[in-house]
Amino acid sequence: AGEYGTLPKERVSEEFMKWAVKSIRPGRLLGYLTETSWIAHFPEIQKLAGVPQDPTWHPEGDVGTHTMHVVDAAAHIAIREQLGADARAVLLFASLAHDFGKPATTELREREGKMRWTSWGHEPLGGPIARQFLTRIGIKSSIVDQVVPMVENHLTHHNTGTEVSRRAVRRLAMRLAPASIEQLVLLIEADASGRPPRPSELPAEAGRIL
């Protein structure tokens, strides 16, 4: 941890960009940071570990485990879609940060007659946390400005009915700018694919906003 403090900000951002653009198994990040004790310098990531989730929806475990599966899925999607360096970085950082709001919002609530773990409101809360984190590690603003609205809207598809109006799609596009709906759908796919043993798939609701 002491060695980290001697690194210039440019080196930190360079290493994170390398992780986002080139890593085949980016999900190893949490384990690596924990083993090196550098995790203490990234509380936004550190706080994800141990945060419980409803096992009905998240059989893979806590938020930290889920996030590492999501970034691995995002890397596969980026390769499949042949994304350029910046587009891949946006997807990977959005995947890493998408649940940054969960540690502060997770609590037991009664749902359908049972006590379940919920994290209502974690999406809008996560946006500013993602911006703070990415800015602190030196990621350029053109990437940060796309990641933040993706984090804040990554559950939008759950709020749509069977029919989505053009007006609703236009409003979503405005909320996402400068990111795009197409980018958001890739994040939604990565998020849904980060819940093993559930199958990797794009939720049907997400297809309706395209």
Regions found by a protein language model. Give the residues of each.
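Short, well-ordered coil↔helix boundary/capping segments
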Residues: G64, W120, P178, S200-P203, ...
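Charged substrate- and nucleic-acid-binding regions of tRNA-handling and nucleotidyl-transfer enzymes
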Residues: A1, Q132-R136, S193-L210
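Glycine- and charge-enriched loop/helix tracts that form the active or gating conduit
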Residues: A1-R88, L92, F100-G121, L125-S142, ...
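Short, low-complexity, polar/charged sequence segments that are solvent-exposed and flexible
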Residues: G113-K114, R170-R171, A206-G207
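Acidic active-site catalytic centers that drive phospho-/nucleotidyl reactions
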Residues: H98-D99, D191
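Histidine/acidic-rich helix-loop-helix segments that form or flank divalent-metal centers
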Residues: M17, V51-E60, Q82-L83, I139-E201
